[in-house]
């Protein structure tokens, strides 16, 4: 915790970035009434030091924001568990089971550990246990659950209505091979 009188002077990166975010997104933050930061997790493998680092850095930002403002904060840890299984990790049992399910969404791939309904669910639980062991404060969100619940429907409809305009913006930013 930094003393209030030193907050303006600190050059620690979480405070520099938090001040920048509060300044640049002031009207949006005031309208929303809270600040939400998000981390992402691709559950095709077990949580690792990179996963820890992303949540730790985001938690440092929240700590800085909490010292700079009284607005409520939240960290969402978002699991991209609808991603396809691209390769079989070396550190799992029943690798042949996973081989048969390459390119399927992780929540449709059987759990090689035989503990959960899917490999995605297994790794999501591993992630939550991992983060909980370090007392991180977060809200967990699964892309599978959110898509199935219709959470993204209105946004997806907006994208479809504006498809041509969106493509006119995105395509020029891509290399020829990705267009």
Protein language model features and the residues they cover:
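Non-catalytic terminal extensions that flank enzyme cores
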Residues: 1-49, 63-77, 93-103, 129
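Short, solvent-exposed turn/loop segments enriched in Gly/Ser/Thr/Pro and often Arg
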Residues: 76-83, 143
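A glycine-rich helix N-cap at a beta->alpha junction
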Residues: 94-134
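Active-site cores that bind ATP or allylic diphosphates and position pyrophosphate for catalysis
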Residues: 132, 136-179
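The substrate-binding groove and active-site-proximal loops of carbohydrate-active enzymes
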Residues: 5-7, 43-52, 106-118, 144-146
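Active/ligand-binding-proximal structured segments within catalytic/core domains
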Residues: 50-61
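Charged, often glycine-rich, active-site loop that binds/positions anionic groups
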Residues: 82-99, 155-157
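Short catalytic/ligand-binding loop motif for oxyanion handling, primarily in non-cytosolic enzymes
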Residues: 45-47, 82-86, 148-151
């Amino acid at each position: 915790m930094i003393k209030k009188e030193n907050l303006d002077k600190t050059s620690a990166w979480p405070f520099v970035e938090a001040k920048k975010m509060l300044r640049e997104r002031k009207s949006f933050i005031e309208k929303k009434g809270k600040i939400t930061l998000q981390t992402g997790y691709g559950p095709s493998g077990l949580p690792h030091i990179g996963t820890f680092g992303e949540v730790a850095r985001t938690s440092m930002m929240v700590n800085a924001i909490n010292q700079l403002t009284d607005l409520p904060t939240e960290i969402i840890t978002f699991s991209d568990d609808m991603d396809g299984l691209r390769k079989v990790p070396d550190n799992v049992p029943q690798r042949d089971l996973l081989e048969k399910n390459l390119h399927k969404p992780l929540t449709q791939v059987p759990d090689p550990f035989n503990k959960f309904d899917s490999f995605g669910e297994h790794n999501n639980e591993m992630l939550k246990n991992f983060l909980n062991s370090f007392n991180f404060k977060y809200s967990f969100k699964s892309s599978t659950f959110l898509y199935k619940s219709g959470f993204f429907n209105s946004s997806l409809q907006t994208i479809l209505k504006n498809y041509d305009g969106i493509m006119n913006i995105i395509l020029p930013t891509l290399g020829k091979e990705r267009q």
